[in-house]
């Protein structure tokens, strides 16, 4: 929530930053969270588990997942494997290949009026080492997804986050990606408030520059104590835009939505990738691993690749 401090917003305007809130706010558009519908509107071969694919491999995931983080996703390589791993509430779809892009889009009555694209370096098991917030457009993504938005979200005004592989939509969210909004430029959040309050988009970018969002992971099943003073010191390093702590010390571990491969501790947003990677390395010791609840062992912090 640190990004939103000091941004004036009318009391009657609600801007969703998570899928649970967006689902409640937009009953007419919340069908986009149904992955069967995302496939069907694009003519992709797909089906719920129980309907056998005609060819393998396929990609499998929950039909609905409002908590994200790649929960429940897997590749099914063969018919034999499919018979073993069928799961109620899951679907299969094509295993796509190509560039995986996360795109934030400002939309007015279904028409895209602003785009920003981000690509991630995957570590596996739903984890990403870092993300690059690109300055340049993605013409193929904007052409294909712009036409899809105009056909299927007419009447909707607000932010949309689209995840694509090779310009094919795999996820649609009725919100923006709040991980790196400070890298979009001064005045962006104020423009978001105006979009939701008045239905206008008037954000003007003098010049775009790329940014980077570097992720620090720990291990599942371990509680961590944060050295807040050290975190604040690193926030002041030149080239760092922000450091976000991505969990709550006072909440049970299982209450946090996390990827299968690790427990996300913090995010370093920066303008220089080398600076971000160095700050992550220095940040890791600020998270002291307490004893694991079952094994009684102190688990080492994962700092990326």
Predicted feature residues:
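Protein-protein interaction modules outside structured cores
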Residues: 1-21
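Active-site nucleotide/adenylate-binding loops and adjacent lid/helix of ATP-dependent enzymes
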Residues: 18-148
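Peripheral (often C-terminal) accessory segments that flank ATP-dependent C-N-forming ligase machineries
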Residues: 42, 194-305
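Short secondary-structure junctions
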Residues: 46, 87, 152-156, 235-243
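Residues at beta-strand starts and edge strands
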Residues: 56, 99-101, 158-160, 210, ...
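Short beta-strand element of the conserved SAM-dependent methyltransferase core
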Residues: 60, 92, 117-121, 164, ...
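ATP-dependent carboxylate/phosphate-activation module, predominantly the ATP-grasp catalytic core
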Residues: 99-100, 105-154, 166-215
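A short glycine-rich, hydrophobically flanked beta-strand micro-motif that places a catalytic Asp/Glu
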Residues: 154-167, 245, 268
């Amino acid at each position: 929530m640190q990004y939103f401090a000091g941004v004036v917003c009318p009391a009657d305007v609600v801007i969703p930053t998570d899928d649970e809130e967006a689902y409640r706010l937009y009953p007419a558009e919340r069908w986009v969270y149904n992955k069967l519908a995302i496939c069907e509107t694009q003519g992709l071969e797909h089906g719920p588990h129980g309907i056998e694919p005609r060819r393998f491999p396929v990609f499998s995931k929950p039909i609905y997942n409002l908590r994200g983080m790649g929960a429940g996703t897997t590749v099914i390589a063969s018919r034999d494997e499919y018979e073993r791993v069928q799961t109620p509430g899951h679907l299969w779809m094509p295993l796509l290949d190509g560039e995986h892009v996360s795109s934030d889009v400002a939309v007015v009555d279904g028409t895209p009026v602003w785009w920003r694209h981000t690509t991630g370096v995957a570590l596996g098991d739903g984890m990403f080492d870092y993300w690059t917030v690109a300055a340049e457009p993605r013409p193929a993504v904007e052409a294909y997804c712009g036409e899809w938005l105009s056909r299927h979200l007419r009447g909707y005004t607000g932010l949309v986050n689209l995840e694509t592989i090779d310009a094919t939509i795999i996820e649609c969210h009725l919100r923006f990606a709040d991980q790196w909004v400070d890298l979009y430029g001064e005045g962006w959040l104020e423009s978001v408030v105006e979009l939701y309050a008045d239905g206008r988009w008037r954000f003007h970018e003098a010049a775009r520059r790329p940014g980077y969002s570097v992720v620090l992971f720990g291990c599942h099943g371990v509680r961590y104590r944060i050295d807040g003073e050290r975190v604040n010191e690193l926030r002041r390093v030149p080239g760092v835009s922000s450091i976000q702590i991505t969990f709550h010390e006072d909440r049970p571990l299982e209450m946090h939505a996390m990827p299968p491969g690790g427990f996300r501790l913090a995010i370093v947003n920066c303008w220089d990738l080398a600076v971000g990677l160095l700050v992550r390395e220095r940040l890791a010791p600020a998270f002291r691993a307490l004893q694991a609840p079952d094994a009684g062992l102190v688990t080492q912090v994962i700092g990326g690749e």
